[in-house]
Structure formats: structure tokens, C-alpha cells
Amino acid sequence: MREIPPERIELLSRIEPPAYEVSAVDSAPSSREFRAAMEEYRKRNYSGAIAGLRAAAAAQSKSVEASFYLAICLLMTNERSGGIQELQAVIAGGSTPYLEAARFYLAKALLADRNIRGADVQLRVIAEMHGKLEKQAQTLHAQIVPTP
């Protein structure tokens, strides 16, 4: 793998939190904790959203929505290892509306941890999914992995 300067890693691994959109798949009534947490998330109060999202994720174990936004909040508050764990749980949930984005944010978090190989794997999988993040994944991949 290519040696990437720390300041370049910091730039490439920076995330822009996704907007919250109600998913048709997660159309089950959301908990009061989840709704309150997502109000904090919308206000960009990521640390204020964490407790409610943790409670919602525990209460709705079959829904990955709370886990996904919890992961984003953890990443935004520099709790990278917790964010990585939550993203891995979302990915383990299989084919959901959050799968591609979870892989993308996981790639960014792994890159921030200087785990270039792990980021490489996630970005390749995203490209193979041919979803809406395909081009972004290919662009980021080209910047971290040398072309043969």
C-alpha cells in the first residue's frame, strides 16, 4: 500500500454526516428516544443524540436505522472505535437501505485509523454494488491505492 501523509489521511477520511431521511423499510413506528435523538442529530448536536440512539438501537434490535445514525454520531464526536463497531453491525444486518452508506463511512473511519487495506476492501465492495456511492468510492479508492 502507498504511504499517505497524515494530513492527506485527515482530509480524505473527513466525513460529512448524511441527512436523516425516513426510510420506507424502517417504517415501523419509531420510539420516542429515536425521534428525540434525531431532532438533536438534525441540529448537528451529535453528542446529544448518542444516548437516545443507543436506547433506540437496543430497543429495536432488528432495525439498523438507529445503529447507522449512532455510528455517524460516534464518528462525529471522535469515538471512532465505537463508530466502526456500529457500522460493522449495520453491515452484518445484510441488505438494507443503509448497507452502501455504512460501507462508505466504514471505509472513511478505517482510513482515519490508517487501516488502508480495510478501507480498500470496503471501497472495492461499494464499487461492485453499483449504487449511488459508486463514483465517490472509486474516486477515494484511486487516491489511497496506487494503480498498477
Where does each model-flagged region fall?
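Juxtamembrane extracytoplasmic segments of single-/few-pass membrane proteins
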Residues: 1-65
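Short coil turns that delineate tetratricopeptide repeat
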Residues: 27, 61, 95-97, 131
